[in-house]
Amino acid sequence: MSTIRTVGLVAKYQEPKAAEMVRWLVPWLKQRGKRVLVENGVVRTAAISCTKKEMAAKADLIVSLGGDGTLLNIAPLVERPDVPILGVNLGGLGFITEVAADELESVLTKTLEGDYETEKRMTLEIRVQSKNGKVHRFRVLNDAVIAKGARSRIIDLETYIGDDLLCTYRADGLIISTPTGSTAYSL
């Protein structure tokens, strides 16, 4: 575990409780000598405002305030495996955002002291090549859904693992999931 010097805060924009927590967290973290990064547009604070991508590159810890969607949005941008993401559930879906809002101060105190455990999660790198040859790349923690367009009834798919062809088929879509995302489809 590396020393936590810079903490990034991402939050669900529409959630007033998230903005309130950011306003509380910025001075709380600064009092503990931490550099604080806040996602652009979340709330005006004394923290450094940046994009999620910049935050993912610079933070030693990311605190995600919202629900699973907020965490799933930042996770693929974090490319360094030593950067923990602390998911704080503010009342929505929270299967992977395990910390309740009223537990945040005590959990974050322990985390900053190095008293925490991480759980490694698999991510997928998805590459989609359209008929015109354009390639789109995505990293996902949960799942990727490839669906037919509004005009199509069915699409032709070639599925590869790395450079090896797995299968070809016609379908209305494809869902590729990590172990984290697979549980969502059983609900």
Model-derived features: positions:
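ATP/NTP phosphate-donor binding region
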Residues: 1-61, 102-117, 128-138
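Feature detects long, helix-prone N-terminal segments enriched in hydrophobes
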Residues: 59-62, 68-69, 78
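AMP-binding/adenylate-forming core of the ANL superfamily
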Residues: 173-178
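Short glycine/serine/threonine-rich phosphate/pyrophosphate-binding segments
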Residues: 18, 69-74, 183-187
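Generic beta-sheet signal
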Residues: 39, 65, 86-88
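Catalytic core of DAGKc-family lipid kinases
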Residues: 93-172
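Gly/Ser-rich helix-loop-strand patches that form or flank binding pockets
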Residues: 73, 77-91
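Short amphipathic alpha-helical segments
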Residues: 21-23, 75-78, 98-100, 187
